[in-house]
């Protein structure tokens, strides 16, 4: 309530002062003084609301507002919002704008009664705003569901008059919330509908499940009938009895040819198993998931590869020929006959050098090669003289073993004076006839896969000559092989 110029208060509660006609300019000067006396910062664009309201009320009474309040009155007339102020600062007698003021408020941590009341009020107002938002969201969802429900009910009335059994629209089918609402409505009004909504959806889902099952069975039957029609032309037909006859004929034809690799396995194992109790039949979950085709393809591929691999007979002579390509076919055949067709035993015999005695043809051929090899019988290997096995030679103790290995001395026409065979040299362990210091692949002649030829005559023709004053341990430099000078080479 404001005090009027005559000292009376307005009992009506308004701000309309009773002024005399001669004093029309007095409120203007008073307004100027009041407006200039209020401490307002330069950032404020408008004066306080109380002052604006009092000025507006005085303007309605016929008092012209001052020139400084034209902007404020224009802002109020245009409907600009009021600038929010900090409540904590207002409680302590300071007016400050709230925008950007939260961090810099000097009373933000104040715990007085007024500030505590303000904090509690802000908390309650925030809870009210959150509650209103939640209620508005629930109302909007309920409106949408009611709209869908009304559309479904209108569609059900139209289709019931036409004789159709489906009463739901596509939108209702796609919305789970609408499904719940429709189910609740059906339970509330049991007499209005004979079939509940959830049963209709279950029927649709079951129909969708049965479609891939039928497709899978049809594809299996078509794949089953193709190979059967090629082999059994007399059982072709369109009826189900003919199809079963074809399947039985195909199954009976499979065990008749177990060794052939051209047997066609059925891609549908349920037809071959003969029932659901068999371990190879697929379960309903496999059929629904659609993975039985991939599993059947992998299973058929592995079974076909195994059948083709196991059905091919292995030739033991061919196996020996691949393992020992340097051996002659007749020799390998004789070893295999001696071992009674056992490939493993024949390989062990060849590797251990315990072959049977060669026949007369092999002996004659070995004698010819041995005679040709006599020209180059004197050679040095890794610094050890094999040509003249005297008492000073390092291999002189091996001469006593020549009688024990006499049967093997003619293999590949190796020199009998060496007292060991090339096979025994190549495949012997370090603890046997040799002490392991001779490499089995120093020369091509020692490799069992290659025939031993007298190539020493022209391997190193006269490149290195042995001096007469050098001992035998300096005959080879770097493990190379060369000739010892004798009467033929001089």
From Swiss-Prot:
**Per the database record, which ranges form the DMA domain?**
314-349
Would you say which domain of life the source belongs to?
A: Eukaryota
Start-end of Low complexity biased regions: 20-31
Sequence segments annotated as region (Disordered): 1-31, 152-171, 207-289
Main location class: nucleus
Pfam families from the UniProt entry: DM, DMA, DMRT5_DMB
Keyword list, A-Z: DNA-binding, Metal-binding, Nucleus, Transcription, Transcription regulation, Zinc
User: In the UniProt record for this chain, what is stated about the effect of gene disruption?
Assistant: Mutant animals are viable and fertile, with no obvious anatomical defects. Ovaries from mutant females may have an elevated number of polyovular follicles. 25% of mutant males consistently exhibit copulatory behavior toward other males.
Q: Alphabetically, which GO biological process terms does the record hold? A: male mating behavior; ovarian follicle development; regulation of DNA-templated transcription
- Cellular location(s): Nucleus
UniProt xrefs under SMART domains: DM
In this chain, composition skew of type Basic and acidic residues spans 1-13, 207-216
The reply on keyword Transcription regulation is yes
GO molecular function ontology, one term from the record: metal ion binding
DNA-binding region extent = 86-133
Q: What GO cellular component term, any one, is given? A: nucleus
Bias (Polar residues) occurs at 217-242, 269-289
Which tissues show it?
Widely expressed, with highest levels in ovary, testis, epididymis, preputial gland, vomeronasal organ, liver, salivary glands and heart. Also expressed throughout the brain with highest levels in the olfactory bulbs and medulla. Detected at similar levels in gonads of both sexes.
Give the UniProt family note: Belongs to the DMRT family.
What name has this protein been given in UniProt?
Doublesex- and mab-3-related transcription factor A1
Give the organism, scientific name.
Mus musculus
Q: What is the lineage of its organism?
A: Eukaryota, Metazoa, Chordata, Craniata, Vertebrata
